[in-house]
From Swiss-Prot:
Domain tr-type G: 8-277
Name the record gives this protein: Peptide chain release factor 3
Gene Ontology molecular function: any one: GTP binding
Source organism of the structure: Actinobacillus pleuropneumoniae serotype 3 (strain JL03)
InterPro entries found in the cross-reference section: EF-G-like_DII, EFG_III/V, G_TR_CS, P-loop_NTPase, PrfC, RF3_C, RF3_dom_3_sf, RF3_GTP-bd
Length: 526
């Protein structure tokens, strides 16, 4: 197959949802339909307890939530689909944001009993930054749901995106009978499939067919016809250009748990979602059709293989083809490296990649030299932009139970901060170690991983820090004066960047007023 054909058949997407909307179930069912796993919801390990394929960290196993982002590749409809799993728990980290910089489209999963929830709103704001095309799956039709028309209205008004229903539900809960495909004029009748059973779906042609009345009952058939008249009058038709621009979302109804409707949105994804897209660098735009290799690191994850103390850097291939043993330029450090053992992912199963194309995600073994945001090329000096680092909103001082392990603690914290799991600050005036996070759960993750991966027992204490900003200044003399007068508020982060840590927002505002020549940054490019 030629290079353009390989690139054109790739689709790279992430699933976004509020916790408990059914994202983990959908992820499994997508893999099931892609024949990538045999039993949904399980990797039967030696302990024979089932763990979802994409949840591999110890704490995730205990809590049943997907904290880290994994990558899964599977074939579907003559396409190769890369699914990036994003954390679905109550408070998520920058990992989620950064993962969304590595995809070309997203599937938004909504719990049809609840409608649009707060996390979904937050994630949609992130996809807006790059006008990412969005498909929508209204989940849990096997339960009692809100009025479907009301759900569409809510998505339109709250998320500011037009809805184009592709399928329409017939009943819900115990009365759920299936969905009607508007463009194809076909009804797909619901039979619950459990676990890894995908039922053969019975299809009824035509909305006026007596077979439809016989299958779902006169009342529901008539209700469907009435609702469709309303829908066709009140909602939008699917418009591919508006979808690609992130202005309109095709909407599918189904139940992931009942293995129903998942294939409809997969068909939509492979048919409509964009092939790998161009990306901006600080020098020029790189097109996916270019044959020279380039890519950027959007995530670093430690210890994916408990048997090996390794760290893997996840790289999105932007252009060209990766081949085993190829020489690439690691732009930030200006060094050429030979990559002979990159990984491809089927969650939990890591295979060595012989080749990878634009749109694919590969894993590079990292011994501390690779950072989030790093660019790799075949020689060209450029840096991909738009991979953010956010100023944390929560801070704690971290302290050792055994003071002799200070070295391991620092090593662990710096590695976890390079991974983006948390940020670490070392104040200039003392030997404290302050941990900053975007969400509370990150603190638990850090303590649990320090214990299991670095054999360090640590505890947190309250610390008088309300917020942090990265500081820079073009005038060296003024910067020195600022540093001299504010030493008690300055710290170095994990990458040795100077940071202003403020005990209150008032303190920060005063500092910004007092030093107009100093730039205080809330986000920083990696």
């Amino acid at each position: 197959m030629s290079y353009p054909q390989e690139v054109n058949k790739r689709r790279t997407f992430a699933i976004i949802s509020h916790p408990d909307a059914g994202k983990t179930t959908i992820t499994e069912k997508v893999l099931l339909y892609g024949n990538a796993i045999q039993t949904a919801g399980s990797v039967k390990g030696k302990g024979s307890s089932a763990h979802a394929k994409s949840d591999w960290m110890e704490m995730e196993k205990q809590r049943g939530i997907s904290i880290t982002t994994s990558v899964m590749q599977f074939p579907y409809n003559n396409c190769l689909v890369n699914l990036l799993d994003t954390p679905g728990h109550e408070d998520f980290s920058e990992d989620t944001y950064r993962t969304l910089t590595a995809v070309d489209s997203c599937l938004m999963v909504i719990d049809s009993a609840k409608g649009v929830e707060e996390r979904t709103i937050k994630l949609m704001e992130v996809t807006r930054l790059r006008d990412t095309p969005i498909l929508t799956f209204m989940n849990k039709l096997d339960r009692d749901i809100r009025d479907p028309m009301e759900l569409l209205d809510e998505v339109e008004s709250v998320l500011k995106i037009r809805c184009a229903p592709i399928t329409w539900p017939i009943g819900c809960g115990k009365l759920f009978k299936g969905v009607y495909h508007i463009a194809k004029d076909e009804t797909y009748l619901y039979q619950s499939g459990q676990g890894s059973t995908i039922q053969e779906v019975r299809i009824v042609k035509g909305l006026s067919s007596p077979e439809l009345d016989a299958a779902v009952g006169d009342d529901l058939a008539n209700q469907l016809r009435e609702e469709l008249e309303l829908v066709q009058g009140a909602s939008n038709e699917f418009d591919h250009e508006a979808f690609i621009n992130g202005e309109l979302t095709p909407v599918f109804f189904g139940t992931a748990l009942g293995n129903f409707g998942v294939d409809h949105f997969l068909d939509g994804l492979t048919e409509w979602a964009p092939k790998p897209q161009a990306r901006q660098t600080d020098v020029r735009t790189v097109e996916s059709s270019e044959e020279k290799f380039s890519g950027f690191v959007f995530k670093i994850q430690a210890n994916m293989d408990p048997k090996h103390r390794d760290r893997v850097a996840f790289m999105r291939v932007v252009s060209g083809k990766y081949e085993k043993g190829m020489k690439l330029k690691h732009v930030r450090i200006g060094k050429d490296v030979v990559i002979s053992d990159a990984l491809t992912f089927m969650a939990g199963d890591r295979a060595h990649a012989e080749e990878a194309y634009a749109g694919d995600i590969i894993g590079l073994h990292n011994h501390g030299t690779i950072q989030i945001g790093d660019t790799f090329t075949q020689g060209e000096v450029m840096k991909f932009t738009g991979i953010p680092n956010f100023a944390p909103e929560l801070f704690r001082r971290i302290r050792l139970k055994d003071p002799l392990k200070q070295k391991q603690l620092l090593k662990g914290l710096v590695q976890l901060s390079e991974e983006g799991a948390v940020q670490v600050f070392r104040p200039l005036m003392n030997n404290d170690l302050i941990v900053g996070a975007v969400g509370v759960l990150q603190f638990d993750v850090v303590v649990s991983r320090l214990k299991t991966e670095y054999n360090v027992e640590a505890i947190y204490e309250a610390v008088n820090v309300a917020t942090a900003r990265w500081v820079e200044c073009g005038d060296a003399k003024k910067f020195e004066e600022f540093k001299r007068k504010n030493e008690q508020n300055l710290a170095l982060d994990g990458g040795d960047n100077l940071t202003y840590i403020a005990p209150t927002m008032v303190n920060l505002n005063l500092a910004q007023e007092r030093y107009p020549d100093i730039n205080f940054f809330k986000t920083r490019e990696h």
